[in-house]
C-alpha cells in the first residue's frame, strides 16, 4: 500500500512538471551537404533559442562548434540541443554528420532517438549516404524535408518519386512548392509553399527572415487546382491504411476532399507516421529561410513522444515493458526503476568527463547512487546537465525521454559508451530493493560499432612522449569507440584505426593540436583482418586449485546469431564483428543456485578482455587482428566456491585462447579486406574509360549501369514503383535540362563494388578520366576474403 501511494504522489508531481506527450527526440540525418546544420540553425532561430542565424561557411553555427568543424565546414560529431516550439513542445534535437567516415556518430545517435528528420537535397535527389542512413534508422518514424528548392535543377516531384521507390515508403505531401516569376529575369523562383492541410499559400520575404505572407487559397486563387488535387491525393493515400479517415470522408465531409478537417488529417498523418505506414514530406530552402516553421509544426504534429516510440531492446527478452502516457516506460512492472543508456563520452576542459545518456524509464536525479549493469559496479553521480550544443545547463533531474549528461569525479572510470545504468527513482541509494537477477542485470542491447577500414602508425617523438601519447589515444578512443588502438608485437608499432582517411585526419589533428601529443603519424593504409576458415579444436586448461575452462573458437556464420540457442549468452567484442558465447553451465544458474563468492557478471567481465586480447593478437598470414570469430566458452568451466578473485581465471583464459590459436595451421586462416560500394556519376561520353578503369585497375565488380534519374526497379520495390507512378505530383519548373549533359542525355550512374585498397586516391583518377565531369560516392559494404592473385600485393603493400 505504501509503495502504491508513494508512486501516486510521484505521478502527481511528475505530471505537473513534465508533459511527456509534448516531448520529441529527433535526429537530423542526410547525405553530406544536404543542409542539415543550416536547417538546424534556422530551427533554433525560429524557436527563439538563438537571436542570430549562423552560417556554415562563416563557421559560426551553434551545433558545429569544434574548431575542425568550423574550419572545414562539415559536421564531425553529433551535437545535442533542446528547445521549445510554440511553448508547449520540447524538442531534443541531435544534428548528425553526413560524411560516411563518421557513420558511428550517426549510429550511436539513432540508438537513443525516437524519430528522424531526413533532409534531402532537391537537386541531387536521394543520394547514396541518404539511403544508408535511412536503412540505419529502420524502425524510426521519419519526416522528409526537401531542401534547396531554390537551386537550379531542383526537382520536388522527381525527388519524391525517388523517395517512394528507393526507400519503399508512401509519401504524404504536407506542402508543395510555389514558384513565382521574377519580373527582372522572367524566371520562375521558389518563393514559398502551398499548405495542403490548411489550404494556405505561404510566401516568405527573403529580405526579412521573420516575415511570411499568408493567403487563403479559395476557388479564385491560382493554386486552387493544386490544392484540390493535393488534398485528394493525401486523403486517398491515408485511406489505404486508415479506415477512420475513409468513414469521415463519406459521413462527415460529404465526399468532398476539401471538407476533411485539418484535425482529422493531422491525426491520420500522425497515426501513419508512427506506424511506419507513410512518410510526411515538406519542402523549403533553409539557407533562404523558407519552409522551416512548417517543418517544426510537422515535428510537433506527426512524430512520436517517448511514450509512443519503440521501446529499447533488452538483454532479458521476457521483462515486461509497459507504456504510461504520463511517465513513459515502466520496466519489469517497477515504477521506481530508472534505466538509462550511455551513448557518448566527451572531455570538457572545465567539467572533465561528460557522459551523454538517454533516460528510458523513471527519473534520474543528481547525486544519486547508480549501478552499471554492464560492468557490475555501483557509484555516485554528481550534477546533471542538459547540453545546448557546447553550452551546459545544470538540472536537478532528467525525465523519461530526456537526453542529458552525467558529471562527477566517478563517471570517467565507471561508464563507457554503450553501458546501461539503473538507479532508484526516489531513494538516493535504493539499489538493494531491486531484483538482483533481473533489474541489476538488465541491459539495453549495446551500440554496434562498425569495423575500422584504415590504419595509421603512430610513434612518440621521444621515449618521454610515450606515456602522454598513450593517454591522448585513450581519450580519443574513449570519446570515439570507432577509433581503435592496437599494438603490433612484432614491429612494436602502435596503430590507430578508423573509418576513413578523413576520420584519421581529424584524429591526427586532435592529437597534435588539441591534446598536444608529441607524435609522428605515418601514412594511412588500408586495415586488413584475418578470420578462421573452420572451427578450432576444443581445448581445456585447468589448475590444481580448482580453476577450469574449456573453449573452442569458431568462424562467425551470418545465421549463427539468428539461430542462437536459449542456453547460450552472446557478448560483443568491440568492433571487429567478434563475439564471446557463454554456454549455460551444466550445474550452476546465476539466477537460482549460484554458489560462488564472486558474482557471475565478474566471471563474464574477466573472460571478455581475455577474448578480445587473444583475437587482437592476429592470425598467421599477415599478423592481422581476427575478425568475424566467436570464442565459445563451454558449459563445464569451474572455479573454487570461496575464490575471492577471478584473476586466476583471467590468466588461465588468456593462456587457453592463445594456445588454441597458436595450435591452428596457417591454412585455417584467410585475409579479409574492406570492400566498398561505389556509385560513379558520369556523362555518356565518359562511360567507356570509367568502366574500363573500374574493371581493370580497381578490380571492381560492376553491378549495374542506369540513368541517374531513373529508379532501378527490383522485385522488392515494384509495388512502390507502381505507387510512385500513380501519385499526383506538381510540375518541376526548375528542372528543364539542368541535369542533362551537353548532348542532351541524362548522366549515368555506375554501381560497383571494389576493394578499398584499389579505390585509394580514386578522386583524382575520376577527375582525370572525365576532365572534371565525373563524381563518385563510396561507402562500406563489408569484409571479404582477399583473392589469391592479390594476396602477395596486399601483404607487401601493408608491411612496406
From Swiss-Prot:
PROSITE patterns listed in its UniProt record: G_TR_1, G_TR_2
Keywords: GTP-binding, Mitochondrion, Nucleotide-binding, Protein biosynthesis
All residue ranges annotated as the tr-type G domain in the record: 21-307
Location of this chain's protein in the cell: Mitochondrion
Binding site for GTP: 30-37, 95-99, 147-150
Pfam families: EFG_C, EFG_III, GTP_EFTU, GTP_EFTU_D2
Cross-referenced InterPro entries: EFG2, EFG_II, EFG_III, EFG_III/V, EFG_V, EFG_V-like, EFTu-like_2, G_TR_CS
SUPFAM superfamilies attached to this UniProt entry: EF-G C-terminal domain-like, P-loop containing nucleoside triphosphate hydrolases, Translation proteins
GO cellular component annotations of the record: mitochondrion
GO terms classed as biological process: mitochondrial translation; ribosome disassembly
A GO MF term: GTPase activity
Note: This protein may be expected to contain an N-terminal transit peptide but none has been predicted.
Family stated for the protein in its record: Belongs to the TRAFAC class translation factor GTPase superfamily. Classic translation factor GTPase family. EF-G/EF-2 subfamily.
Stated role: Mitochondrial GTPase that mediates the disassembly of ribosomes from messenger RNA at the termination of mitochondrial protein biosynthesis. Not involved in the GTP-dependent ribosomal translocation step during translation elongation.
Name by which UniProt lists this protein: Ribosome-releasing factor 2, mitochondrial
Native source organism of the sequence: Kluyveromyces lactis (strain ATCC 8585 / CBS 2359 / DSM 70799 / NBRC 1267 / NRRL Y-1140 / WM37)
Gene: MEF2
